[in-house]
Every structure is written in structure tokens, then in C-alpha cells.
Regions:
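Basic side chains
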Residues: 46, 51, 69, 73, ...
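Conserved G1/Walker A P-loop phosphate-binding module
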Residues: 1-102
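A general boundary/transition motif marking the beginning of the first structured unit of a protein
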Residues: 11, 103, 169-173
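Helical mechanochemical/support elements of P-loop NTPase systems and associated helical scaffolds
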Residues: 37, 63, 76, 88-91, ...
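Hydrophobic, well-structured mid-protein blocks that either form specific transmembrane helices
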Residues: 82-136
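Conserved C-terminal guanine-recognition region of P-loop GTPase G domains, centered on the G4
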Residues: 112-178
Length: 178
């Protein structure tokens, strides 16, 4: 019990909150996104860095966000609602990857512009998680993304780099990557 004689939320309650995630919408353009008064957390990174898989792992749902071995499968902004049943307490945003993708250059350029606009203008964006393939380290494209969001990070946007694909390396490669 806390000072207000209400039960403290348990760790199980917190886990259940995250695991009631559901697909909300997909959008090819920013003006197609709903305006919601809840915090958004965006997942960004190169094509095939593991953004969709990360969302699925966090929510403990294997097929919430479509994950594929083919780079460039996520071609729109996908929003996932997180919250207790019937409510939206936060949004997880799966953005298209940048860099290598099996799509025409013009489509890649369009995705990159939409993603940059989303990161710079989305009012309820509270955090950005950049997934980085640990076998590659930070690439020139990752550095470009950092420059795009630097002003928002300086204004208080939370930012995290999440290294992925460590399971694909042997011990020596892992030590070198660190």
C-alpha cells in the first residue's frame, strides 16, 4: 500500500500493460497519422536492423509488427497502441529502415524524407530508439540520422542506441564491436 491506501502496482501489472499492445494504423504520409495525446516512442535504424523484431520482443507478440529477412519490408509508418485493454497509454512507432533495401532509389528517398519529417515534427514524440547492427557499428547513414534529430535531443527528446544482432557474432567479434 502507498500513502493513499491504494495498492502499489506489481511488476506483473507493468508487464501486462506493455503486453496488451495492438496494431493501430499504418500511414504512407504524415498527414495520414492520427493526432493522439499520448507519448510516442519511435524505432529507427537501417533496413533489417531489427526494428520490427524489437517491437515484437518488447510486447511479447511474435507477429504484432511484421518482421522479414528481406530488407525494406516496412514501407510505411506503423503505429502500435500500448495500454490496458481498450485504452492507449503510449504509441510504439515502427519507421521504415534507411540504407539498403530491395526497392527503387526514389522510394528510399521518399521514405527517408517522411521519416525525417516525422522525427522533426511529431509533437508527442518522447523517445527515439535507434537500432544499430553491432556487426556494422554506426554507419554514415546512422550519423546522418543523429544530425537530423540532434536539435530535438538537445531540447529533451530521449534517445537510445540499441545494438542488435550480437547473437550473429562470435566472442572475439563481440569484444571488438564493444
Amino acid at each position: 500500500m502507498n500513502d493513499n491506501n491504494t495498492p502499489e502496482p506489481s511488476a506483473q501489472d507493468a508487464r501486462n500493460w506493455l503486453h496488451t499492445s495492438r496494431f493501430l494504423t499504418t500511414a504512407a504520409q504524415l498527414n495520414q497519422l492520427p493526432t493522439l495525446a499520448v507519448p510516442e516512442i519511435a524505432f529507427v535504424g537501417r533496413s533489417n536492423a531489427g526494428k520490427s523484431t524489437c517491437i515484437n520482443t518488447l510486447t511479447q507478440q511474435r507477429q504484432l509488427a511484421y518482421a522479414s529477412k528481406t530488407p525494406g519490408r516496412t514501407q510505411h509508418i506503423n503505429l502500435f497502441s500500448v495500454g490496458r485493454q481498450g485504452t492507449t497509454d503510449a504509441i510504439l512507432t515502427d519507421l521504415p529502415g534507411y540504407g539498403y533495401a530491395a526497392v527503387p532509389k526514389e522510394a528510399k528517398r521518399r521514405w527517408q524524407q517522411i521519416m525525417a519529417n516525422y522525427l522533426m515534427t511529431r509533437r508527442n514524440l518522447r523517445a527515439v530508439i535507434m537500432l544499430c547492427d553491432s556487426r556494422l557499428g554506426l554507419t554514415e547513414l546512422d550519423e546522418s540520422l543523429l544530425e537530423i534529430i540532434r536539435p530535438r535531443v538537445q531540447d529533451g527528446l530521449d534517445f537510445l542506441v540499441l545494438m542488435t544482432k550480437a547473437d550473429k557474432m562470435n566472442r572475439a567479434e563481440g569484444q571488438k564491436a564493444l
